[in-house]
Amino acid sequence: MSDTLLTLRDVHINFPARKNWLGKTTEHVHAINGIDLQIRRGETLGIVGESGCGKSTLAQLLMGMLQPSHGQYIRSGSQRIMQMVFQDPLSSLNPRLPVWRIITEPLWIAKRSSEQQRRALAEELAVQVGIRPEYLDRLPHAFSGGQRQRIAIARALSSQPDVIVLDEPTSALDISVQAQILNLLVTLQENHGLTYVLIS
């Protein structure tokens, strides 16, 4: 069995930039221009580039939110479960839900497991990411930026994903908190055999 989870071959993503008076696109913006990559099980693939170079577009492609304009996007084997951790944890967390519901949101959407099972899983994952279980009934605004990112990571873990895409997961955090989150990601990768795509 291959350890390759995802493969991109000569992938291009173009967006319309200008249309003529008939509504036909005459110019395109080339957000991704001929990229090749492989994502292998258990590794961390780093995507580094300056602002506006297409990193976030690539993240959306990997998550299935965009389709290639040209080239091949290949998921090896069965349907892969992908999760994403965003740059700004507060904007990615539902402000009206208690934290335990946020952590298990992917399971609720998929209609998997009972509420009691989801609550137990939320407590287990909270401990793994360093959130005290007695705080799980609080809303996101009650937590610091670093704690909110830990909650977002726990949510990504709840569906047992094959790949987690991390879109600048520490850039909105203080330096000391950045180190804590990166150390947490390393520990979780070792414990769960996770595969990361880390965008910076």
Each model region followed by its residue ranges:
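Conserved ABC ATPase signature
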Residues: L139-F143, Q147
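Helix-to-loop junction immediately C-terminal to a conserved catalytic motif
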Residues: M63
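Conserved ABC ATPase "signature" region
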Residues: Q117-E134
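The feature captures the beta-strand-to-loop junction immediately N-terminal to the Walker
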Residues: V48-G49
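Hydrophobic anchor residue at the start of the ABC signature
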Residues: I153, I181
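A short, proline-enriched helix->beta-strand linker immediately N-terminal to the Walker B motif
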Residues: S158-D162
